């Protein structure tokens, strides 16, 4: 849980005691080997010299996936090269894939589906330059901790529960809840 969850409970009248207990992470703190990186890049035909972003989680619109796709479409339209790994599955998967096609992002997005193998998951986090996690729905994003265990910073919405404890530019990156802000932050990071 998070401090933001407690604040929400207080707003609806909860007056009892509480304990804030952030999510733990069972992924070991590790660096992914050069061989593992090369294997994943070959598997998905990822060029060596492009920024690599990752979204990990359920494929549902209320996680603000549309903001990610709109920001990436802006980057593409500005002539920026990058790849976005979409790792997970969910009820809105087909609609998200349709939006990817509509935005002209098919050549930029790598769809992995659900990955259960923890070592393979480590590899995807490890090759990524940045986790994109603009969800304002999640109370305490486990994926942020998983990415951090692989030395991959996260881009989060300022003021969201997932962003609690993140220092902008030091332990992650913060933006406002908009595609333009995500794009601006990505442009700054890519420079």
Name each region found by the language model:
Residues 136:
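Aromatic "clamp/platform" in nucleotide-sugar-dependent glycosyltransferases that forms part
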Residues 114, 122-128:
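Short alpha-helical donor nucleotide-sugar binding micro-motif in glycosyltransferases
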Residues 20, 158-169, 173-174:
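Short acidic/histidine- and often glycine-rich active-site loop of Leloir-type glycosyltransferases
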Residues 4, 24:
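Carbohydrate-associated surface elements
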Residues 168-169, 173-179, 187-190:
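Conserved acidic donor-binding segment of nucleotide-sugar-dependent glycosyltransferases
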Residues 153-157:
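Short hydrophobic beta-strand element within catalytic cores of glycosyltransferases
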Residues 97-115:
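Nucleotide-activated donor-binding/catalytic signature segment of Leloir-type glycosyltransferases, i.e.
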Residues 47-63, 69-72:
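Conserved donor-binding/catalytic core segment of Leloir-type glycosyltransferases
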């Amino acid at each position: 849980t998070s401090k933001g969850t407690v604040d929400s409970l207080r707003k609806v009248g909860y007056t009892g005691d509480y304990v804030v207990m952030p999510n733990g992470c069972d992924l070991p703190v590790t660096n992914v080997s050069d061989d593992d990186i090369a294997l994943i890049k070959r598997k998905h035909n990822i060029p060596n010299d492009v920024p690599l972003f990752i979204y990990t989680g359920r494929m549902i619109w209320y996680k603000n996936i549309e903001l990610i796709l709109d920001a990436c479409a802006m980057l593409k339209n500005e002539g920026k090269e990058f790849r976005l790994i979409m790792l997970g599955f969910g009820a809105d998967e087909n609609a998200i894939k349709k939006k990817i096609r509509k935005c002209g992002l098919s050549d930029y997005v790598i769809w992995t589906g659900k990955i259960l193998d923890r070592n393979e998951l480590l590899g995807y986090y490890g090759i990524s330059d940045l986790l994109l996690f603009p969800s304002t729905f999640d109370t305490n994003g486990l994926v942020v901790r998983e990415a951090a265990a692989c030395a991959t910073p996260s881009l989060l919405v300022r003021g969201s529960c997932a962003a609690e404890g993140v220092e902008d530019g030091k332990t992650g990156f913060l933006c406002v809840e908009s595609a333009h802000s995500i794009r601006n932050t990505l442009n700054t990071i890519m420079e």
